Amino acid sequence: MIERIWSGRSWLYLLLLPFSALYGLISGLRWLSYKTGLRLPWKAPVPVVVVGNLTAGGNGKTPVVIWLVEQLQKKGYRVGVVSRGYGGKAESYPLLVTENVTTAQAGDEPVLIHRRTGAPVAVAPKRVAAVKALLANTSLDIIVTDDGLQHYALQRDFEIAVIDGVRRFGNGWWLPAGPMRELSGRLNRVNTIITNGGTPQPGELSMTLAGELAVNMVSGEKRAVNLIPHAVAMAGIGHPPRFFATLQQLGADLKKEYAFADHQLYTEDQLCHLADTNQNLLMTEKDAVKCFNFAQPNWWYLPVDARLPQEKGEIMLNKICSLLETNNNSK
C-alpha cells in the first residue's frame, strides 16, 4: 500500500499532505538554521564524505559506502565509517563495532560494512559523537558516513546522493504523503549523484549492483545461483523486489518469495519455516549478518557489489583524494 501511495497511484496521499507540509517546514527550518549560522555544525579534523539519499527506503547507498571504502583503502588511506545504526539498540552510545558486536546492538548495515571492509565503524544517533569516538580510538585519514545527508550537525566536505533510478522520487512529496526526506532540488547542492539502476539523467553516475556467486552460510561453499535447486528467496531490505529480480536475472528458479520490513530482526524458528529440508533459502548479505548464529545447511546469501563507470568513478575518487591531500598539507 505504501508503495502505491508514494508512487502517486493512490489518492490516499492527499489525506497525508498536511503532515507532509509540516515535515517539510520543520526540515527546511532546520537546514536554514545551519545555513544562516544560527546553529554551527561540528567540523572534524579529517575530511568527511556523506553517502546518503533523499528518499526513505533502500536506494543502494550501503553498497556505495562499501565500494568507496574499498577504493580509498586500495589507495592507502585509513578510512573510518559512522552510521546511525538503524534497527539496532545498544546499551550505550557511541558503539564501536567489533566481531563481538551483534546486529541487534549496532544494526545490520554497520555490521555488514565492518565485515566486508574491515574498516573501523562507530554507531551513534548523533553522528558527531560517532566520529569523535572513531578518532579517539584510531588514526584515520577520512570518515565516510553511511546515510546522514540530512544530519547537518556534522560538517561535510563531500556529498554523494544515491537515488533509485527506477522509482526516482515517486510522487515528489515529503514524508509521509511521499517518500521524500528532502525535495529533489537538494541534488543541486551535492557533489555527486549516483543512480542505482534505471536510466541516469544528465550529470548522474550510473550504478549497478552485481552479484555472481551465492555463499553457503554454514560451509562457506560458493555456487552459481542458477545451480541452487528449489530456491526460496527472502529479503528484509528497503525494496525487496530488486533482490528477487536480481536472483531471477542470475537464473534462479524461485519457488517462493518472502518480503520483510527493512532492518527486520529474525528468529531461527521464523526462517526455518520458509524453506523445508528439500529447498534452499536464498537471502541478501544484509539479512545474512543477522542469521549466522542459527544458520542452517540449506541457507545461502548473495553478496552484491556496486559497479560504477571506471572513468567517472575515478574522477569522483580523485576529487575526494584532493580533499585528503589539501587536509594533509594544512597540518
Curated annotation (Swiss-Prot):
The pathway is: Glycolipid biosynthesis; lipid IV(A) biosynthesis; lipid IV(A) from (3R)-3-hydroxytetradecanoyl-[acyl-carrier-protein] and UDP-N-acetyl-alpha-D-glucosamine: step 6/6
Checking Pfam families in the record gives:
LpxK
Q: Which UniProt keywords apply?
A: ATP-binding, Kinase, Lipid A biosynthesis, Lipid biosynthesis, Lipid metabolism, Nucleotide-binding, Transferase
Q: Which GO terms describe its cellular component?
A: plasma membrane
Question: Where does this protein hold ATP?
Answer: T55, A56, G57, G58, N59, G60, K61, T62
Listed under catalytic activity are: a lipid A disaccharide + ATP = a lipid IVA + ADP + H(+)
Q: Which domain of life is it from?
A: Bacteria
Is RNA-binding tagged as a keyword? no
- Is ATP-binding one of the keywords UniProt gives this record? yes
Q: Name one GO molecular function term.
A: tetraacyldisaccharide 4'-kinase activity
What EC numbers are recorded for this enzyme? 2.7.1.130
Q: What does this protein do?
A: Transfers the gamma-phosphate of ATP to the 4'-position of a tetraacyldisaccharide 1-phosphate intermediate (termed DS-1-P) to form tetraacyldisaccharide 1,4'-bis-phosphate (lipid IVA).
Name the family the entry cites. Answer: Belongs to the LpxK family.
Q: What's the protein here called?
A: Tetraacyldisaccharide 4'-kinase
Name the source organism.
Answer: Photorhabdus laumondii subsp. laumondii (strain DSM 15139 / CIP 105565 / TT01) (Photorhabdus luminescens subsp. laumondii)
Q: What is the lineage of its organism?
A: Bacteria, Pseudomonadati, Pseudomonadota, Gammaproteobacteria, Enterobacterales
Chain's gene name: lpxK
